């Protein structure tokens, strides 16, 4: 992460403020502005953690804050340590520690061994802007607290950022949920991460989720989640990427489209290719439609690329989906509170009935994709090549990017879809 100091702004400062709040160094306004209160909290944190107290958040201070970014600490066992004393030191619980450390024997702690200690707050924040760095912290935190959740890479973005996936379950049936093919639809990232966290917790504690036994879902279905398909674009829209070669190139591209606000109107990957127009399912028709609208070269949105799958993010999703061969996919977008369920005349078995179930639990409407945007999408390609149920979920209402204040409603509306997707 970049160095933060007095006068810094942006989502990295929001995350810093959140971490300081979590660590009880002041109730800070999460406004993304590194002002006097934030600096004073940093100074107190540095002083109490044996760091140089200069009020500047450099590599050493970031490292010290990682437990409050990720939601877990690592504790090296000392003589006379017990799980009780370790839990008390961090405000954790014995059960949380046992879940995070399968096989750990409380009566046989080895001096020098390392214990993962969950901290007493939710991992996934729902009140700040998301970035690729925050996504990675959440992925790490979920996997550490709930080690039955497996994590890995779908691939890499243009800028080399990891396209993460998480998976949970041991059933033969596989489903695949993904979000943020479009940069300014980044609010869908915490939707999927929060679902993963809630589901993992419900399974670990023997609880239900949306009225269903998490254990039964876990035994029946393996849920795969790719929370952020376009991390470079998300960083551009949320303000984390605000300088450098890639930013300047995106700014030059956007200058050719003055009617699209920059960076808030940016949907594409960092090279100006719309990732949800990159799949080999009527790509030529998508090209005709978008060229007719004037999107003939890299753009903030709607440019189909020079050929299908030239964007590394789309290629990675394509290859990963082929290897996974899921029974059902959900592609999360915003906005409109709409469920798109078919591609051309393809209607996989039960796909309409499943869509109607999703509508019933969410309040969303079921509609056909408009012709002008009805080709070359991820959902379109999946239905065409697999002949299995695939859905684009347009969450929330308003102008993209939707404000994080909509998160609670969006999540409540979509929890049933995410659970039923693993059951139908």
Which residues fall in each region the model found?
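Extracellular-facing binding/remodeling surfaces
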Residues: 1-2, 18-31
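Short glycine- and acidic-rich boundary segments immediately preceding or forming the N-terminal edge
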Residues: 3, 85, 96, 116-162
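Primarily a LysM-type cell-wall glycan-binding module
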Residues: 8-18, 31-36, 67-91, 113, ...
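Conserved hydrophobic/aromatic packing and binding residues within compact polymer-binding modules
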Residues: 17, 42-45, 97
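C-terminal accessory segments enriched in acidic
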Residues: 78, 83, 95, 111, ...
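Loop/turn elements at helix/coil->beta-strand transitions in domains of secreted/extracellular proteins
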Residues: 147-150, 161, 172-174, 219-224, ...
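Short beta-strand-to-loop junctions in surface cap/lid or active-site-entrance loops
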Residues: 164-173, 180
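Active-site/substrate-binding loop(s) of hydrolase catalytic cores
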Residues: 172, 186-187, 192-196, 200-340, ...
